[in-house]
Regions:
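N-terminal Rossmann/SDR dinucleotide-binding element
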Residues: 1-30, 241
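C-terminal substrate-binding subdomain of Rossmann-fold SDR/epimerase-dehydratase oxidoreductases
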Residues: 13-14, 152-253
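NAD(P)-cofactor binding segment of oxidoreductase domains
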Residues: 26-31, 45-72
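Short alpha-helical oligomerization interface
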Residues: 40-57, 92-100
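Conserved Rossmann-fold NAD(P)-dependent oxidoreductase catalytic core, especially the SDR/UDP-sugar
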Residues: 59-103
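Conserved beta-loop-beta element that borders a ligand/cofactor-binding pocket
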Residues: 77, 112-137
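Flexible, glycine-rich beta-alpha linker
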Residues: 81-82, 99-103, 127-144, 201-202
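Active-site helix of classical SDR
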Residues: 103, 107-110
Length: 253
């Protein structure tokens, strides 16, 4: 909170508290819905928290923007599409069928569909984006990269699930935010946009989990150990952001 820029008000509350959400939404022009439980490991231990925040919370927010007629952008994930085979060249597009494989991705898929239903049924002015894996400053310690860095800083080995062959399509948080701003300013109501840093057809933002950990260990002088793989671990994510690049003129920096 100490790093918040001037003019930003931090309000701590429950995304499912309808009266609070109504009040906050009514006092603003635009809502960007980042709020979510988002760590897969946690969703395997306690799915109920994900149903509460990701589904009930999105419902509460949709009702608030419906009552106040505010513009909404809903942040989602590439994980709603499931995963792709290792070694392939195919990619997720905006028309890829949903095939979530974890409680987290299932609740995010459900929240996407709620937004689409409120757009069609109630005329809510909303857009959706599905983004690949983020990295950057101040990321929560539960996430893959800061978790490994923190382990090494505290004298523990970094931990790699299984063989580490899983592939992720990484994007810096600043590029993600720039894409969201482009959608808010130039996107079409009711549309969905994929966000990813790989150039179309190249996979140049692809890195295996093992490569990420080896790079961290090399830079920090640490070591890593293999641990049992996560149940249902997705193998590869590849995002095709052609629509976002072509229609809105966005590109990662």
């Amino acid at each position: 909170r100490a790093n918040l820029p001037e003019g930003i008000e931090f309000v701590e509350g429950d995304i499912c508290e309808q009266s609070l959400i109504d009040e906050l939404v009514a006092a603003n022009d635009t809502v960007i819905h980042f709020a979510a439980e988002s760590h897969n490991d946690n969703s395997l231990r306690d799915p109920s928290a994900f149903v509460h925040s990701n589904l009930v919370g999105t419902f509460a927010l949709l009702e608030a923007v419906r009552k106040s007629d505010k513009r909404l952008h809903h942040i989602s994930t590439d994980e709603v599409f499931g995963d792709l085979e290792l070694g392939g060249t195919d990619a997720f597009t905006e028309t890829t069928p949903y095939n979530p494989s974890s409680p987290y991705s299932a609740t995010k898929a459900g929240s996407d569909h709620l937004v689409r239903a409120w757009v069609r049924s109630f005329g809510v002015r909303a857009t959706i984006s599905n983004c690949s894996n983020n990295y950057g400053p101040y990321q929560h310690i539960e996430k893959f990269i800061p978790r490994q860095i923190t382990n090494i800083l505290t004298g523990q080995p970094a931990k790699l699930y299984g063989t580490g062959a899983q592939v992720r399509d990484w994007i810096h948080v600043d590029d993600h935010n720039d894409a969201v701003l482009a959608i808010l300013e130039r996107g079409c109501i009711g549309e969905t946009y994929n966000i990813g840093a790989s150039s179309p057809g190249s996979g140049d933002a692809h890195v295996t989990n093992k490569q990420v950990i080896e790079t961290i260990c090399e830079l920090m002088g640490g070591e890593y150990v293999h641990v049992a793989d996560r149940p249902g671990h997705d193998q590869r994510y590849t995002m095709d952001a052609t629509k976002l690049r072509r229609e809105l003129g966005w590109a990662p920096k």
